[in-house]
């Protein structure tokens, strides 16, 4: 049954309101991120240590995702995801695939549940864009094979506002300001990149 939803977006000091007629095939949903099985975490560690190839890691990821999809269906989920099993970070992996975005290892950790989450430093090395095909598109195609009459595939991506915040906040703007005169210009390029990714999906 169609549901009319009012969406309010605040960005860069401006408020925008949208009304969307959304037809949802179910009444509940889940975020889409699941705990990684130990064998997948082990394979990822071996990949970063140079002990296995990218293709070997992908094969392990495919196995873990296939098992996860089966479990989601058994539990009666109507929206299925890959659990974000191909990612090291729920948001940064998506950003790193954009033109102009680079990252490097860091020893500094960010506090997360009384632990230090070691995430790569992420910064701009040029204008943000998406001239190629984002890797998440292939991830989505792999998952699509599992759709059936009771399930639909959901691709999770960070919100554009999360992407913008990564570089518009003071710690990120230092690098970003070398390529953008204003945050509004950065936001526009991010939006164009997202449009390309979503179109390809």
Regions found by a protein language model. Give the residues of each.
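Short, Lys/Arg-enriched N-terminal segments with co-localized hydrophobic residues
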Residues: 6-19
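Domain-level signal for soluble alpha/beta catalytic cores
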Residues: 16-200
